[in-house]
Design a protein with these regions (language model features):
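N-terminal leader segment of winged-helix/HTH proteins
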Residues: 1-35, 130, 138
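Functionally engaged cysteine thiol sites
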Residues: 12-14, 54, 88
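Flexible interhelical turns and helix-capping residues at alpha-helix boundaries
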Residues: 17, 21, 52, 63, ...
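A structural signal for well-ordered alpha-helices, especially hydrophobic packing surfaces
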Residues: 21, 107, 140-143
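N-terminal helix-turn-helix DNA-binding core of bacterial DNA-binding proteins
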Residues: 22, 26-69
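Charged, amphipathic alpha-helical coiled-coil/dimerization segments
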Residues: 25, 75-134
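DNA-binding alpha-helical recognition surfaces that contact promoter or target DNA
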Residues: 72
Length: 143
């Protein structure tokens, strides 16, 4: 055993998480292409479908995205007609985001079958999926 075993890729927790994330997102791609969304745009829309309206800051915090990623993402969603951005009436410094009529229920309806379709691609029991879900959120809570 050498002094650098801790630097082997196979000994890193981060690598299988990274690789699995990339592979899972690949499974989403064909479904998301049909509704003209990238994966990051899709998760942003999921937040907006839940909350109906939120600030850019809240959206970024929820999705762990910085403004350098979020700004072009929102610009693209706005150009597609899925969202609108406006200044908060309470605080002009705050930019609010909300789905348009098309980006709201219409797009949500088209996206509705995606989680089940993607989930069926993986050979995980309901118990395994629940355990993985809990462990991943436990890790996120420690970051």
């Amino acid at each position: 055993m050498d002094n650098y075993d801790h630097l082997k890729l196979e000994n890193q927790l981060c690598f299988p998480l990274y690789a699995a994330s990339r592979e899972i997102i690949k499974k989403y791609r064909p479904f998301l292409d049909e509704i003209e969304l990238t994966y990051t745009q899709y998760v942003a829309m999921m937040v907006l479908w839940e909350r109906e309206r939120c600030s850019v800051k809240e959206l970024g915090e929820t999705l762990y995205l910085d403004s350098g990623t979020l700004s072009p993402l929102l610009k693209s969603l706005e150009a597609k007609g899925f969202i609108t951005r406006s200044r908060s009436e309470e605080d002009e410094r705050t930019v609010m985001v909300e789905p348009t009529l098309y980006g709201g229920e219409a797009l949500r309806e088209k996206a509705s079958p995606i989680p089940q379709a993607v989930g069926s691609c993986f050979d995980l029991s309901a118990e395994e999926a629940e355990t993985l879900y809990r462990l991943l959120y436990k890790l996120l809570g420690k970051c």
